Amino acid sequence: MKIGIIISSNDAETCWNALRYANFCLNQKDEVKVFFMGKGVEYQKVGTDKFNTVEQADKFLKSGGKIYACGTCIKAREQEGSEMCPISTMKDMYEIVKESDRVVTF
C-alpha cells in the first residue's frame, strides 16, 4: 500500500508519533512518503530527548522512506533545506496525495 503522511504541527510529541507511524508502515512493507508543511518544517528544532524527532526521521530515511518539505514554509522561517527537510513544492504534495492509497495528517 502507498501511504502519504502530511505533518503540519511543530509539537514535538505529534511529530515524533507521526514519524514513528511512518516507520511502522515501512516495517509493514508499505511505501511511505512524508510531507512537512507549515509549522511542521520546524520538526528538527522542536525534538527533545523524550520525543527525538531527528532520530525517527533518520531511521525513516535509512529504511527507504522519502521526506519532502514545503519550500515556501521553509523560506518563511528563514531556514534552509537539507536531506532531512528537502525543499519541495505543492506539486510534490499533490502527487503524494494523488498517488497514495491512504493519506494521514498530523
Name each model-derived stretch:
Residues 38-41, 74:
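Short beta-alpha junction loops
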Residues 3-16, 41-48:
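Short, glycine-rich nucleotide/cofactor-binding loops
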Residues 75-106:
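C-terminal structural segments of small proteins and small subunits
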Residues 50-76:
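A glycine-rich helix N-cap at a beta->alpha junction
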Residues 14-27:
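Histidine-anchored nucleotide/phosphate-binding helix
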Residues 22, 32-37, 67-71:
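Short internal beta-strands
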Residues 29, 64, 100-101:
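Short, well-ordered alpha-helix to beta-strand connector turns
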Residues 20, 49-54, 86-89:
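Charged helix-capping and loop-helix junction motifs
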